Amino acid sequence: MDNRYYRHNRRKYSLKVHIVLVTKYRKQLLQGSIADDVKQKILDIANTRGYEIIAMETDKDHIHFLLSYDATDRVCDIVKIVKQETTYYLWQKYNSVLSKQYWKKKIFWSDGYFACSIGEVSSATIQKYIAVSYTHLRAH
C-alpha cells in the first residue's frame, strides 16, 4: 500500500493519518470485549465509508489507528464520525457498564484527538510504532 496511489476523476493521491483517541477522563475501559468491539466498529465504519484501516491497537485508555482516506474527506470529520458511531454503539451494548463510569452524559471519548499525517514517514514505520507501543504497554 505504501507506494500505491489512488486515482479518482482527475485526482491522484495517497493520504494516510495516524489518529489517537483517548477515553474521557482516561478511564481504563478499552479492555476485553469493549476493546474488541471498538476495533470492530471502527473497521465497520471504515468499510462503509471507504477508508482503509492499515493498523490499529488499543491500550486501556486510548486507541491508535493508521487510516488511509479519500482526498474529499477531512480528518476532523473522520474523527467526528468514528467518535459518534462508536460511542452510540458502545452505549447500546454496554449501558450498564458505562453508566457506572459516566453518569451525567452518554460519552466515551475525550473532546480532543491526536492526528498526524505521515507524508514524511513511511506507513511501515507507523505500523511498527503502533505494534511496538502496544507490545511494550501490555508488558507493563
Please tell me what each predicted stretch does.
Residues M1-Y134:
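Basic nucleic-acid-binding interfaces
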Residues T135-H140:
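Conserved small/polar residues in nucleotide/adenosyl-binding loops
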